[in-house]
């Protein structure tokens, strides 16, 4: 029989109702019924990345669509938690509201001591520190999720350390560290020491991420721009190779690659 979605619901209630119907043990969708928080995690991550892609391309039609998909993931996880009697979407929203109000006393509590952006950032970090301590954090680095993408986690670790004064003075000093890591990597490559090569390459990546931070550049955006640049240039080279019916060898590829700049 057909499952009817309740009428006269607001948009949020409607999407919750849809998810609950999909997960109905008797009349729901077999695929949706089988899902749990762990099986959905990869889809949640994918949707978040697709939101970022829509933002970077400036496509608001796509952004509207992708935000809806990401919202659906939030609802899904909340409904699954509700089934386990852990929390529901109202709890999620309430906690988010409380957190934002707590971190913005200059808006909601009329705290006149917070006036500038610097004051706001300082108080924001202060509140986050208190929140981490309340969760049992013993180090300023505690609470940086190990499930984050490696680049994102590296950046968060660096920012936390920097707030405690453990940081390079400027981008020039950071660049010196990058050069130092390049030299160390070169030495290990000459020795063909695979274990040390991996270690030094990791140090180089970490230092490059740090340099991006010190230059005030978003490292993910920097890498995505470089990816797009490579993709555009490669496709141009590819097109020229095919158009001129050139043999696909390294010499021709290098020549056309230089032309595609």
For each of these PLM feature ranges, what is it?
Residues 3-66, 72-201, 205-261:
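Flexible "arm" and connector segments at domain edges
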């Amino acid at each position: 029989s057909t499952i009817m979605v309740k009428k006269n619901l607001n948009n949020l209630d409607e999407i919750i109702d849809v998810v609950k119907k999909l997960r109905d043990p008797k009349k729901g969708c077999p695929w949706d019924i089988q899902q749990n928080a762990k099986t959905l995690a990869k889809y949640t991550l994918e949707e978040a990345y697709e939101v970022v892609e829509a933002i970077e391309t400036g496509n608001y039609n796509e952004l509207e669509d992708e935000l809806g998909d990401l919202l659906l993931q939030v609802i899904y996880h909340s409904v699954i938690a509700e089934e386990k009697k852990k929390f529901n979407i109202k709890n999620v929203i309430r906690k988010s509201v409380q957190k934002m109000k707590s971190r913005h006393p200059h808006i909601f509590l009329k705290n006149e001591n917070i006036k500038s952006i610097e004051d706001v950032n300082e108080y924001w970090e202060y509140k986050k520190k208190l929140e981490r301590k309340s969760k049992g954090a013993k180090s300023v680095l505690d609470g940086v999720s190990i499930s984050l993408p490696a680049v994102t986690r590296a950046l968060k670790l660096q920012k936390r350390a920097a707030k405690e004064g453990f940081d390079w003075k400027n981008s020039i000093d950071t660049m010196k560290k990058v050069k130092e890591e390049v030299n160390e990597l070169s030495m290990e490559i000459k020795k063909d020491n695979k274990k040390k090569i991996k270690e030094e390459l990791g140090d180089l990546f970490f230092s490059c991420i740090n340099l991006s931070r010190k230059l005030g550049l978003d490292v993910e955006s920097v890498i995505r721009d470089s990816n797009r640049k490579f993709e555009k240039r490669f496709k141009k080279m590819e097109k020229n190779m095919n158009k001129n019916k050139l043999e696909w060898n390294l010499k021709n590829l290098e020549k056309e690659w230089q032309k595609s700049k």
